[in-house]
Amino acid sequence: MPKRTDIRKILVIGSGPIVIGQAAEFDYSGTQACLALKEEGYQVVLINSNPATIMTDKTVADTVYIEPITLDFVTQILRKELPDAILPTLGGQTGLNMALELANCGILAELNIELLGTKLSAIDQAEDRELFKNLMNQLNEPIPESAIAHSLDDAQEFVKQNGFPVIIRPAFTLGGTGGGIAENAGQLKTIVKNGIALSPVGQVLVEQSIAGYKEIEFEVMRDRNDNALVVCNMENFDPVGIHTGDSIVFAPVQTLSDREVQMLRDASLKIIRALKIEGGCNVQLALDPNSERYFIIEVNPRVSRSSALASKATGYPIAKMAAKIAVGLTLDEIYNPITGTTYAQFEPMLDYVVAKIPRWPFDKFNKGDRQLGTQMKATGEVMAIGRNIEESLLKAVRSLEIGTAHLELDGLTSVSDNDLVQRIIHPQDDRLFYLAEALRRGYLIQELAELTKIDLFFLDKISHIVELEEQLRSEKGDVELLEIVKKNGFSDEKIAKTWQITPIQVRQMRQESGIQPVYKMVDTCAAEFESQTPYYYTTYEQENESLVSAKPSILVIGSGPIRIGQGVEFDYATVHCVQAIQKAGYEAIIMNSNPETVSTDFSISDKLYFEPLTLEDVLNVVELEKPEGVIVQFGGQTAINLAAPLEENGVKILGTSVANLDRAEDRDLFDQLIQELNIPQPVGKTATNAPDALTIATEIGYPVLIRPSFVLGGRAMEIVHTPEDLTHYMQEAVKVSDEHPVLIDRYLMGKECEVDAICDGQEVLIPGIMEHIERAGVHSGDSMAVYPPQNLTEDQKAAIIDYTTKLCLALDCHGLLNIQFIIQNDEVYVIEVNPRASRTVPFLSKVTQIPMAQLATQLILGSTLAELKSPTGLLPAGPLIHVKAPVFSFSKLTRVDSLLGPEMKSTGEVMGTDVTMQKALYKAFEASGMHLPSHGNVLMTVTNQDKAQALALAERFREVGYQIIATPGTTQQFKAAGIPVQQVDKINATSGDLLDKIKAGHIQLVINTTGLNEAPQVAKDSIVIRQTAIEHGIPLLTSLDTTDAILTVLESQSLLTKPL
């Protein structure tokens, strides 16, 4: 059936900020869908609150709204735009829940707007646990015994009949939020209460646990003529019980018989047909390893994280197809864009193995709860392609960028047998490495299968890797063995370490023996048809399928997996860089390892290499392609760290030179530069050991800011107030800095500002200055930023422009440079210079309308600002005010302290834009989920040094209609100043516990600040207060500057009531 002509304008709902469970995969699917709809001639309107995405670029949709995805704002846009239809299935859980809200409030019926792709009834049937259960019973598809619970009593009733363990799944939530496995009454109470609180409909499913079954996923598509197909099937390495987003996954399935695959395939197609979904859908199934018994776990009636993985694993662009099906096209009318000759109704076939490994944030949150279960904790993921499981698994391990190139971790060899077994039974993020260690110690795969319920087949593959390690040790220098281990994914680094030579010597040995990697194409059809796509992976075989073109090329290094500190912003910059390279007439080649992103969409670049971002893998691509040069500015710290080793191996780095990158990153060289330019900076020195550090800190004077050099996202950064704290930090953090010294600076309390500049070596363009709302001491990635700045004097701006220009020219910068400043007592200090694209580039590009990454790329390729007729100096600001606000994922990460400081903790960002500061702030808070009622109770527990400032804020809260609740110390001070306060006892007191007040919903906002030199009990209590607020979804502020900003919003909305 041809596409529909009765609709013209379509609204696409984006997925909002990146949080755990909903990351860059929705930027990828949303971008694909918008472009596909435009390709078919429809007018596309997009709403998304996340400025760091490609999909919010003006070129992706016809009209782009960066506004909060809330009922009020979306309704306002619907009334203004009057679209014919809405496509909600590409914006993750956010998009689906929004579609339901819009339907339920009646606006869609009123404006006669149709829902495309998946009907409301299907969304309801898949997401509402009770309707889903009824549908499965009608279809005669088995699901685990379960009951819907709206209260703890309901859940206890089910357990009485069915016993423990049970799995609890809240309805309409994302990434398993609020769910878990309960093995006893205590756990049941905690998880059920939490789950009901976090479910938007106050409903959880309690089901008999099938933990230990094999977890299988089918990614299926269907069109309106009822054609349906399986795009990809995937098998979780970890059994049921660990969220699929936290599982290692292989595609295609590895351990099932043909009969089992067929059985699960039939069930998946039966379900998508019964739900009448038009587009993509993900079905999760559990298979009993000892029989052919299976259960349906759940169905996602939308494009998901798994569909991004399936798209990249097969080359079949699911989101693009889903968008075309949504407007009436059928699978037998749409061409498969990879082959260009076959239609989309052919099921992809794979002649390789894909491995996905999640990337967790525990390198930043070393106190976080690392236990894996039904609630997702990973921030991102990597994917690798190989000809066998060993190869794809080891390639994926080295893509993670966690400091290891093999199945080994520091300190594993010294773990006791007892601890080893415990870590294998109770899975954490690093279980894979413990399994390998157990096999090295002689444990049998049968024993490990018994303990973990992981299939023997997978354990045997790890065992094979361990056997090859053993052989490597005993047969040093054996060329035949070298070829075997390379075919099994071993890195040159691992071989070098075992043979006690350097990786470059291993490389030379390989080259002399003709053991060279070849590149194979991802073509959706196992080489059955001719393919058009330039999408490749390496392996050690005979025939190379990647043909080098005669056109000069540029290689761009991507930013790898999404993690805290290095998010989708860097992918945004990478994609823009590629677009500029293509416009300049070069062939653009991307190398990256992240399946969720736009940059790894094969249609973006001229060639895509899906490979780990390590020196060995990049050199392999460089040797084949012989590009004009490599660009490292846009891939975050991942790419910058490769610059020097690449240059040492004769690779040309484009843009700012490696020597100048080093001058910005190396502390001593940077200090020299700052002194030469006569630019003020906080007093600071470097130390390589604890005694040095103590001496320096005493000289400079406490408090000091201490951090390792060469880091991103403030990794292991702290403000230290006492020598004891410093000693403790040196024991913890110097381990972090491997051979790099730590930097110790005088900590300045002041206003923080930030600049992204673009330079061609002669002239400098400063698109804008951003002012942070939070004072120095909160990481810039966790601060709210305002553009244009609201509180800078002309003199301060002039100093910022002067220092920026001097630094750009002194570093002979070609491309982008990010500088952070502190202003204290009217003096402007430089605190940090990053010679690369920073995480503020997308935000600043959107608000200034300067395509910064593209412009920077043109300069990297040799153009000048003058030739491009670009303005220079500080650009004049427009009439609107823009606020960028961070978004956190603390509700997914138990035991991670939500107190903001110099270590970055946010996972995503939103933006609010309006004509006044108050309105822009209001939008930013709304978009980030921080919605405050106009009145209520605010709990204030603040540290002594904050009490004076808190007093003024408390008075303002009273004025707008809030009642103040405080602990005894704060109450005393407030009462003395004449502010009415309700006192609550501290946590350890016996009566009227303040935690009960939070749990019972009596408190609408918690403000909690702690000093670093608090008494241990006070600090502990503060953590419990913050954790309780997060668990119960109560807005929490840990900075008085943010509190001041929220008050500004509340004041602007409250009407004056004053007696005559």
UniProtKB/Swiss-Prot annotation:
ATP-grasp domain residues are 133-327, 671-861
Which EC class, in a word?
Answer: ligase
The terms under GO molecular function for this entry are:
ATP binding; carbamoyl-phosphate synthase (ammonia) activity; carbamoyl-phosphate synthase (glutamine-hydrolyzing) activity; metal ion binding
The UniProt note on the cofactor reads as follows:
Binds 4 Mg(2+) or Mn(2+) ions per subunit.
Q: Which one Pfam family would you cite for this protein?
A: MGS
Residues noted as binding Mn(2+) 1 in the record, renumbered to the chain: Q284, E298
Spans annotated as Oligomerization domain: 402-546
Q: Where is this region: Allosteric domain?
A: 930-1060
Listed binding positions for Mn(2+) 4 are E832, N834
The EC number on file is 6.3.4.16, 6.3.5.5
Question: Which residue intervals make up region (Carbamoyl phosphate synthetic domain)?
Answer: 547-929
For binding ATP 1, which residues are annotated in this chain's numbering? R129, R169, G175, G176, Q208, I210, E215, G241, I242, H243, Q284, E298
Q: Which residues bind Mn(2+) 2?
A: E298, N300
Segments of this protein annotated with the region Carboxyphosphate synthetic domain: 1-401
Q: For Mg(2+) 3, which residues are the binding ones?
A: Q820, E832
Q: Which CDD domains match?
A: MGS_CPS_II (cd01424)
Q: Name one GO cellular component term.
A: cytoplasm
Q: Which SUPFAM superfamilies match?
A: Carbamoyl phosphate synthetase, large subunit connection domain, Glutathione synthetase ATP-binding domain-like, Methylglyoxal synthase-like, PreATP-grasp domain
Q: Please quote what the entry notes about the protein's domains.
A: The large subunit is composed of 2 ATP-grasp domains that are involved in binding the 2 ATP molecules needed for carbamoyl phosphate synthesis. The N-terminal ATP-grasp domain (referred to as the carboxyphosphate synthetic component) catalyzes the ATP-dependent phosphorylation of hydrogencarbonate to carboxyphosphate and the subsequent nucleophilic attack by ammonia to form a carbamate intermediate.
Q: Which HAMAP family match?
A: CPSase_L_chain_A, CPSase_L_chain_B
Stated name of the protein: Carbamoyl phosphate synthase large chain
